[in-house]
Amino acid sequence: MANIHSTNRPILVVGGGISGITAALEAAEAGYHVVLIEKSPYLGGRVAQLYHYFPKLCPPQCGLEINFRRMKQNPRIRFLTMAELASISGREGDYVVTIKLLPRYVNERCTCCGKCAEVCETEIDNPFNYGMDRIKAAYLPHGFAFPMRYVLDPSIVETEEGKKCRDVCEYNAIDLELKETAIELKVGAIVWAAGWDPYDASKVEYYGFGNYRNVITNVMMERLAAPNGPTRGKIVRPSDGECVKNVAFIQCAGSRDENHLLYCSGICCLASMKHATYITEQHQDCNVTIFFIDIRALDRLEDFYTKVKTNEKVTFVKSKIAMITEEEETGDLMLEGENTNTGEQIRMKFDMVVLATGMVPNRINVDPAPDVSCDEYGFMVHDPEKCGIYGAGCVRRPVDVATSVQDATASALKAIQSIVRR
């Protein structure tokens, strides 16, 4: 059993995705107190939204559930959801941070009976499914959310709808009087594990995302395939619910582009290959075409690339697609571009197009900003001269889940060193 190290300066971990959870657990199990904050109503981050993830292509529920159990059993971890970092001051070993707490309007008495959702008539876009379906404004974030507790959308709090939700709850779990608050903490080190956002595909105007319903992004594809997704795992066209028969993937949609993201996000190629297997396993008569600039499939995952290439239903075409147009009557999509290898002009029709958008790091957005080093793309860079605040996972570079876990462990050790030095 780890010794408990006496200090009134816990480690603050910002971000409750797989990197933040890992950093918090590693530090706490080494005997240090940790405060973990997450801006959404649940822990698990982007990994919770995956259907399968590398390297074993298994669902995320098992791995996350084990980590949640470890967290619940460890008294040295305190976690806060719907919490955001508002300010940082001080230096290594002696920081003062302000944390903004947004109201959930549902307290610890919630039993997830769902009666509030039953009486609620207002619907909102489902953030967990990237807006591909609608949910009640009194909702459980998703089926294995941690903490397992409902949330009220602010839009109904001051309405009769909110009062109906409150009145139907026999456990007095709904409090419509809750307000935004702030707390101040003294911490010894900070692990910034705030993760990433998908690049806004609507900025790549010539691909029509947001205007053409059958143009979706890679993160949306992940939700389409998931059993707890908007279609209960059925991979169908968003416009009409028809089974897909001919799907295109466009790699580097907004990446390696001087008008958008200059860098490669590294894992998008493998993600699209994974999605291609989702489709061909579910629809054996469906053809998949992957349009790419270069394929990135490094180390042991190259074997997965080799396996996908042998699938007769999957075709790789070296091309940067120039434009997508839609047939209004059918919703079919016409892709135009050039085959880089042959110089041949491409004009092909598809049922659905998936854009492989890049990963954009979530930066530390407080005023005044702390003295941390970032590269020209906004990814945090470790500077030995600037200790005390450490990046973990995808805020440092685009990486997969396994690499994020390794990186978060290293960041936790760095944070411990900052406390020990003081």
Task: Show the residue positions of the predicted features.
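Residues forming the flavin
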Residues: M1-R422
